[in-house]
Structures are given as structure tokens and as C-alpha cells.
């Protein structure tokens, strides 16, 4: 929580054009107080509609990338404190191999086979490259449920919320995560991904070694989604919605292979 608070203060100074929740200090002037052993923090409310409720256009996709790229650039000047690795290892993209033990929980045989092959490629060709990538604190969950839109100007991102998954990691992960969620249900993934990446690079150019593995990292975020929802379905067998909601992730992962964004 302390790291998240510091990042929000940092963004207010380094990237005031980006709209994030602001910290409201308590009466004693502190940003975090403790009550009965619990850390309490108050954030301002951001107006706007969720991106998930808005019809997507190339211009909007590009602005998603623009906003995220400005965030990535701003985080280059922030020094991450120790122990800033995020709260849940299973959802941390740099630690995606931690999900592998739960692969048998994936019921769909086609998806399970594809994920197994993807894990093999990731372990052999992708994971060894991670230590050389640029690192900083990342948002960790920049998805369509957290980007905000002005309904009167639906081509522009007005804010980003939910900083609870902030963590220190490979900066390219933020773009991979946004692509993974932003392209769910999208029929033209070439148009959408090109627009998001273009907007991002106008603010924060991607290095060649990041570009070569970007779609694999995107795919691994989909893997995390599929495996974790499969595990949740086992723990909540009466909740039929859980497996229904993972359908778009399975479909997008399949499309990434079929259209040669990833080679398995």
C-alpha cells in the first residue's frame, strides 16, 4: 500500500496530465492510517464510463496505448522500494510459470493442449530473455474494466483506476496485459493491436527485444486468466458463469496461434 501511495504521488508530479485517483490525507496529515491492524487509505473518485462499455474504434485503441505509454515513461523516474513485487504471485506475469501446476484444471482439451505447448515455448525461449528487459513499477492490471472514458468524447481515455496490482516487473508487461484484455472479443485483432502499440510507442518506444516477445507475453496473460478461472470453477462448482467468462480468452489465444502472432 505504501508503494502504491508513493507512485500516485509521483505520477501527480511527473505526469499531471494523466488522471489517477488522488490520495486524501487523514486529519493527522498522513496518507495511510491504521485501525485495528488494518491499513486505511482514502482515494478520490474519478468520473467516467468504463472502457468495456464503449464501442471500440482505432482512435480509441490508439489513445489506450497513448495513456499507457505516458504512464510507462513516467515510471522510469520512480525508484521502486524493496518488497514491491505485488500481492499475488499467481497473477504476476513475470511469475506466470507458477500457474503451470494448475494446468490440469483446464477442462477444455484444445485449450489445455495449446497452453501446454505455450508453456514449453515460454520456458525455453521467452523466460530466459526476461532478465535483460527494462524494469520499473507497472500498473499490472490495465484492462478494459479499469480504463475510464468520457462518454461525451469516446475517443479519449480520461483515467486509469485500481492500483492494487502495482508491482515491480518488466515494463513491457503492462502493454502485454492491456493487449490481452483489450482484444477480447475483437474480430480485427490486427487493427486493434496495431493501434494500441502505435499509441504506446509515440510516448514510450518499445525495444526490439521487447517487441519480439510481446505477443507471447500477451498470450501468457491469457493463460493466467484461463488457468485461474478454471481453478476458481473447481472451487465454486455451482458458479456456471466462471467458465463461460473464460470463453473469449480461449478464443483469442487460439486466434493468436492460428494467425501466427505466436508459433507453437
Task: Give the ranges of each region predicted by the language model.
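Active-site activation/catalytic loop segments of kinase-like enzymes and analogous catalytic loops
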Residues: 171-205, 219-237
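All-alpha amphipathic helical-bundle segments outside canonical DNA-binding/catalytic cores
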Residues: 59, 208-218
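Active-site acidic catalytic loop and adjacent metal/ATP-binding pocket
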Residues: 23, 123-172
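A glycine-centered beta->alpha junction motif in the catalytic cores
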Residues: 40-54, 96-105, 224-239
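A conserved alpha-helical element in kinase catalytic cores
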Residues: 1-38, 59-62
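A cross-family kinase active-site recognition segment
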Residues: 27, 54-110, 135
Amino acid at each position: 500500500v505504501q508503494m502504491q501511495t508513493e507512485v500516485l504521488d509521483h505520477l501527480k508530479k511527473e505526469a499531471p496530465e494523466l488522471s489517477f485517483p488522488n490520495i486524501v490525507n487523514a486529519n493527522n496529515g498522513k496518507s495511510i492510517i491504521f485501525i485495528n491492524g488494518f491499513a486505511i487509505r482514502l482515494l478520490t473518485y474519478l468520473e467516467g464510463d468504463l472502457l468495456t462499455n464503449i464501442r471500440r474504434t482505432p482512435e480509441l485503441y490508439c489513445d489506450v496505448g497513448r495513456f499507457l505509454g505516458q504512464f510507462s515513461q513516467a515510471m522510469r523516474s520512480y525508484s521502486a522500494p524493496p518488497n514491491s513485487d505485488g500481492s499475488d504471485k499467481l497473477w504476476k506475469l513475470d511469475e506466470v510459470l507458477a500457474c503451470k501446476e494448475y494446468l490440469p484444471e483446464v477442462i477444455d482439451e484444445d485449450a489445455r493442449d495449446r497452453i501446454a505447448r505455450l508453456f514449453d515455448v515460454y520456458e525455453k525461449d521467452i523466460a530466459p530473455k526476461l532478465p535483460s528487459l527494462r524494469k520499473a513499477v507497472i500498473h499490472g492490471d490495465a484492462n478494459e474494466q479499469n480504463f475510464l472514458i468520457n462518454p461525451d468524447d469516446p475517443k479519449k481515455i480520461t483515467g486509469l483506476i485500481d492500483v492494487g496490482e502495482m508491482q515491480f516487473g518488466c515494463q513491457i508487461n503492462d502493454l502485454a496485459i492491456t493487449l490481452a484484455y483489450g482484444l477480447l472479443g475483437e474480430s480485427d485483432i490486427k487493427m486493434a493491436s496495431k493501434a494500441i502499440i502505435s499509441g504506446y510507442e509515440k510516448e514510450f518506444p518499445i525495444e526490439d527485444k521487447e517487441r519480439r516477445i510481446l505477443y507471447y507475453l500477451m498470450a501468457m496473460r491469457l493463460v493466467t486468466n484461463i488457468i485461474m478461472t478454471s481453478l476458481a470453477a473447481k472451487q465454486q462448482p455451482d458458479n456456471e458463469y466462471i467458465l463461460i467468462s473464460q470463453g473469449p480468452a480461449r478464443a483469442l489465444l487460439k486466434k493468436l496461434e492460428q494467425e501466427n502472432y505466436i508459433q507453437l
